[in-house]
A protein has these predicted regions:
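N-terminal membrane topogenesis motif
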Residues: 1-22, 80, 84, 221-245, ...
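Alpha-helical transmembrane segments of multi-pass membrane transport and lipid-handling proteins
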Residues: 87-114, 318-369, 401-402
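Hydrophobic transmembrane helix module of multi-pass membrane transport proteins
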Residues: 97-242, 246
Length: 523
């Protein structure tokens, strides 16, 4: 069992890293093809698009995982009921997917004109709606395979989806140079819709192969009270996530509009959209990219945190939370140091954008707060505190919207950076405080952030000195720029690890390996 668990964890983590690398590469290429204004328009479309994705998939994905796990955990003689439940879940997914697609198609013109304030978004909104039914079907089948503890179908379908998306986007944009930004954004979203269809077809092929063994060859029969069980999961999850997504969409629509007020005499809407694209489409994806490497820590620790909570093992739960917070602190502080020292040359290399480099440098100190908040959010759900996590998330969105409206018309992008920093502080403090209180864990901020911060000071000092020495390399051709960044990043990381290892990082790494090494007998 442990061998299979570690194999699945390794497969999920490895595929997540590959997918994130591919997605990051695609974003970098898109930024250079579309430019700042084009990325701003693309991000605006994604803000509305994500709202309808949530409507189509959020509730049915959770319902599929939970209900199929319940049905498949029963006796083998009841597998016909499991097949019947899956059919009902697929029907519910199709209904939600078609409804979301129809609603997005019907409101595309209204959303572009009134919500986004840019009619160029109409085509992209319309074509992206065509992928909704396929996404809903994929969400249900993904939940089925998770319930079966089969990760390979999900991994393969996601890799295929990303490959098809990259190929189609590259084909479309290389043949449409010089066309309007709105048309090119429409082609990118069209490629995404096609890739979603391909992914769903892959999942269906895996399902056909897996169905006989999963259901023991039994025909579908009506499961016990399917409508009530589905509805009890669907409406609170769907309602909560759609509300959170709607608030997030509202914030993203307000940012360019409020920036345009500040920039009314300096380019107005066009410059506002460009600045928005440089932050949301260039800088923030780079800042959040390293978080994918924490996936292995999450995969290993979250099930144990949930188990310790369910069994009432308070000491074990406290130890696991302490380890999670300590390791996340070290990793996030290292990532923050790297972006603070090397963010400007990295942005110049990837995007030829000084503004994106400024955003990376400014937000880098907040990375420990961002990463801790994300890990704590997952842990809160693992100990049954998801309502509190959702409540803090909603309040954070409301406060961010208020901050955008109050600060951006007066201070421009600096005001938005302040909103992001204050938001990170609030969500991290609120979620972490609630988790520690509800679990009875004593705070140890010196261990979680103090020791990493000490190592960060030494690494940052070494990194800044090295950056001055390598300044000529950043003004040279691409190979030398890559070499300078690689040497600088590796050297900074090395100094951090050498400083952090005796401060507790070595102790935690050894304990984590001892607890999860292959061949260790399960307690």
């Amino acid at each position: 069992m442990r061998q299979s668990y570690l194999k699945n964890a390794a497969l999920l983590t490895g595929s997540d890293v590959v997918l994130r690398l591919a997605g990051m590469g695609l974003r970098i290429w898109l930024a250079n093809e579309l430019g700042g204004e084009g990325m701003g328009l693309y991000q605006l479309v994604l803000a509305v698009y994500s709202l309808f994705i949530t409507l189509a998939t959020a509730g049915v994905s959770v319902a599929a995982t939970r209900l199929m796990a319940e049905e498949l955990s029963g006796p083998a003689s009841a597998r016909g009921a499991a097949r019947g439940m899956l059919r009902r879940l697929l029907a519910a997914g199709l209904v939600l997917g078609l409804f979301a697609a129809a609603l997005q198609l019907a409101t595309a013109d209204l959303a572009a004109r009134l919500w986004l304030g840019d009619v160029r978004a109409v085509g992209a909104l319309r074509v992206s709606a065509l992928g909704m039914p396929w996404m809903a079907v994929s969400a249900v089948l993904r939940g089925f395979f998770i319930a079966r503890r089969h990760v390979a179908p999900n991994v393969f379908s996601q890799l295929t989806e990303q490959t098809v998306r990259i190929a189609l986007v590259a084909l479309a944009l290389t043949r449409t140079e010089g066309l309007a930004v709105g048309v090119r954004c429409m082609l990118v979203l069209g490629a995404t819709a096609v890739s979603e269809a391909v992914s769903a077809l892959c999942m269906l092929a895996f399902y056909r192969r897996d169905a006989r063994s999963a259901f023991a060859g039994q025909k579908a029969v009506r499961p016990a009270d399917p409508a009530r069980r589905l509805w009890e999961i669907l409406w609170p999850v769907e309602g909560g996530r759609v509300l959170a997504s709607a608030l997030h969409t509202a914030e993203n629509m307000l940012v360019p509009a409020c920036l345009a007020v500040y920039l009314i005499n300096a380019g107005g809407r066009t410059v506002a959209l460009e600045q928005y694209g440089e932050l949301k489409g260039m800088a923030l994806p780079l800042l959040t990219f390293p978080f994918g490497l924490l996936g292995s820590l999450s995969v290993l620790l979250m099930p144990e945190i949930t188990q310790a909570h369910i069994l009432g093992q308070t000491k074990r739960l406290n130890a696991l939370l302490d380890r999670m917070l300590r390791l996340t602190g070290y990793f996030s502080v290292l990532a923050g140091v790297l972006f603070w020292v090397w963010g400007r040359p990295l942005a110049q290399l990837l995007y030829q954008s000084a503004d994106a480099g400024f955003y990376l440098e400014t937000l880098a100190p907040a990375m420990p707060l961002m990463y801790l908040e994300s890990m704590v959010d997952g842990a809160m759900k693992g100990v049954g505190e998801q309502k509190a996590a959702f409540r803090y998330s909603v309040w954070d969105s409301i406060l961010r919207i208020g901050g955008v409206v109050a600060l951006l018309p007066r201070f421009g992008m600096k005001g938005f950076l302040a909103v992001i920093l204050l938001s990170s502080l609030y969500t991290c403090a609120a979620n972490t405080g609630h988790l520690l209180f509800s679990s009875g864990t004593q705070h140890a901020f010196r261990r979680w952030l103090g020791a990493p911060a000490l190592a960060a000071v030494l690494a940052a000092a070494a990194g800044m000195a090295l950056r001055k020495l390598l300044a000529d390399g950043f003004a040279a051709r691409l190979p030398l720029q890559l070499a300078a960044l690689g040497i600088g990043g590796c050297a900074t990381t090395g100094v951090f690890l050498l400083a952090a290892w005796p401060l507790g990082l070595g102790e935690e790494a050894a304990a984590l390996w001892a607890a999860h090494r292959p061949g260790r007998p399960k307690k």
